[in-house]
Structure formats: structure tokens, C-alpha cells
């Protein structure tokens, strides 16, 4: 109960901000409708993290501070992509550079105290590529029929699993930040289903992928999140791309099938984190 009291205020505020922004975009800021999802996710997360952990300085002093700025970068990248509309190759290369820089920044302590330059840059390029693939998976999910709802249902499952796994791995703060993303995704999902607005919360893949990747990297390198759990959480969204239930005439049934399949690797990730968690000696 005490844990819920600590986590609910920031998650609730983030969800409320996301809902308000979606309403504002749909009613009065229609020029931003194509990146409404990015705005809702990014700004909602920033507000939630400020309430949970305070304002993040620049330059950040801790890895978790970077998550605040990753959300902002994700919003700016999504907005620039909508406004400029670059060619696909330029868009992909630009995003790969952004992801590589983001991974380099959040892994700076490992460069300072643990890794050689070669080992460090190998990790940076590998994780940067992983973030690019994650973003692409989320974008492809969103482009499918009923894709916006599917994107947020998948995000709910993945982020709620990450919340539990991170708490089990010894980081209540990271778990709380994952809970904020879960609340935002749940709000966007409900609004998409219950109130089918003319401007759905689209283009959320960039801030979602950057912040999620930052959470998993922080959990793995700076907490006790098992590598298997981090990898399963990162790969889970790709399961939603499988041709599951496509022969069904009910889009809601397809949504349920895909979400259920994504739940499997997420559940395994939580179980692995539970088995690896240190015993509680009280």
C-alpha cells in the first residue's frame, strides 16, 4: 500500500497531463495533430518524472536524469519528422545518430569507471541499433489497422512488466518511472477506444522507444535487472508484428490476440527478474 501511495501521484498527474494535451490538440491545436501522441507521451512523462524525482539538471548528473531529456528529444524528433518529412534513408540515419548519442550519454559512467574505449563503443553501437529497431517496430505496429490502440496496449504490457521487473531488481525509482509510462499509455489507449477522436495520439514511437530504452539500460547497468529480462522486454513489441488473428473480421479481437502474445515474453522477463532478485531479510 505504501508503494502505491508513492507511485500513484506522479503516474496520475502524468496521465492527466497526457489526456489534457490530447484534448487541446484535438480541439484547438490541430496543426500538431500528426504528432499528438509524441506530445502527450513526452510532456506527460516529463511532468511525471519531475513530481517523482524532481527537476533534472542540464547537464544531467545521473543516468535517470537523462530520461527526462530523452522524452523531450523524442518529442522534438517526432515533430521535426512531421514538419520536414525527410526521405526514409535520411530519416533512418538521423534517428540512428540520435539513438547512438543517447546511448553514449546514458552509459557515460561505464566509460569513466569500467570500460575501455573499444568495449564501450561496442556497447553504444549495439544498444543504439537496438533502439532504432525498437522504434521501427513501434512505428510498424502503429501503421497497421487499429494500430494506435495496439501500440498503446503493447506499451501498457511492456511498461507494466518493466515496472515490476525494475522494482524487483532493486530500483524503486526506475520502477516508478516505468509506472508513469504505463499510466500515460493506458490513458491514450482508453481515449483511443472510448473517444475515437478525429486526431488520434499518433507518432508516439520516438519518445516511447528512447525513454523505454533508457529505463532498461539504467536497470541493467546501474541496478540488478537481468540481461535476459532486459532483452525480453526490448523484443516484446516485435511480437505484435506477427500475423496473429489477421483472418479475423474483428479488429478488437486482433488487438486482444496481439496483446496477449506480447504478454508472454514480458511475463517471462518478470519471472526471471523475480528469480534473480535478492532475498528480503526482514
Question: What would you call each of these model-derived segments?
Answer:
Residues 95-221:
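Generic multipass alpha-helical transmembrane bundles of integral membrane proteins
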Residues 1-143, 244-252, 257-282:
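N-terminal topogenic module of multi-pass integral membrane proteins
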Residues 1-15, 174-182, 188-282:
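C-terminal transmembrane helix-loop-helix hairpin of multi-pass membrane proteins
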Residues 32-37, 60-68, 88-94, 147-150, ...:
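Short, aromatic-rich membrane-interface segments at the entry and exit
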Amino acid at each position: 500500500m505504501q508503494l502505491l501511495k508513492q507511485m500513484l501521484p506522479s503516474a496520475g498527474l502524468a496521465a492527466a497531463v497526457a489526456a489534457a494535451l490530447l484534448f487541446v490538440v484535438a480541439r484547438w491545436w490541430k496543426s500538431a495533430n500528426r504528432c499528438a501522441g509524441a506530445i502527450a507521451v513526452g510532456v506527460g512523462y516529463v511532468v511525471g518524472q519531475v513530481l517523482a524525482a524532481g527537476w533534472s539538471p542540464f547537464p544531467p548528473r545521473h543516468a535517470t536524469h537523462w530520461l527526462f531529456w530523452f522524452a523531450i528529444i523524442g518529442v522534438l524528433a517526432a515533430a521535426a519528422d512531421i514538419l520536414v518529412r525527410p526521405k526514409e534513408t535520411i530519416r533512418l540515419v538521423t534517428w540512428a545518430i540520435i539513438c547512438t548519442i543517447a546511448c553514449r550519454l546514458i552509459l557515460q559512467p561505464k566509460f569513466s569507471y569500467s570500460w575501455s574505449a573499444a568495449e564501450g563503443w561496442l556497447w553504444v553501437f549495439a544498444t543504439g541499433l537496438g533502439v532504432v529497431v525498437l522504434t521501427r517496430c513501434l512505428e510498424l505496429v502503429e501503421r497497421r489497422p487499429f494500430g494506435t490502440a495496439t501500440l498503446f496496449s503493447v506499451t501498457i504490457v511492456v511498461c507494466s512488466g518493466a515496472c515490476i521487473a525494475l522494482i524487483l531488481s532493486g530500483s524503486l525509482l526506475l520502477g516508478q518511472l516505468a509506472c508513469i509510462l504505463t499510466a500515460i499509455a493506458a490513458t491514450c489507449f482508453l481515449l483511443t477506444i472510448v473517444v475515437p477522436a478525429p486526431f488520434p495520439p499518433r507518432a508516439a514511437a520516438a519518445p516511447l522507444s528512447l525513454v523505454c530504452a533508457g529505463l532498461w539500460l539504467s536497470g541493467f547497468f546501474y541496478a540488478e535487472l537481468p540481461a535476459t529480462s532486459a532483452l525480453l522486454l526490448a523484443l516484446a513489441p516485435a511480437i505484435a508484428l506477427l500475423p496473429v488473428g489477421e483472418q479475423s473480421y474483428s479488429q478488437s479481437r486482433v488487438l486482444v490476440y496481439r496483446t496477449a502474445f506480447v504478454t508472454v515474453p514480458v511475463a517471462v522477463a518478470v519471472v526471471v527478474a523475480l528469480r534473480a532478485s535478492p532475498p528480503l531479510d526482514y
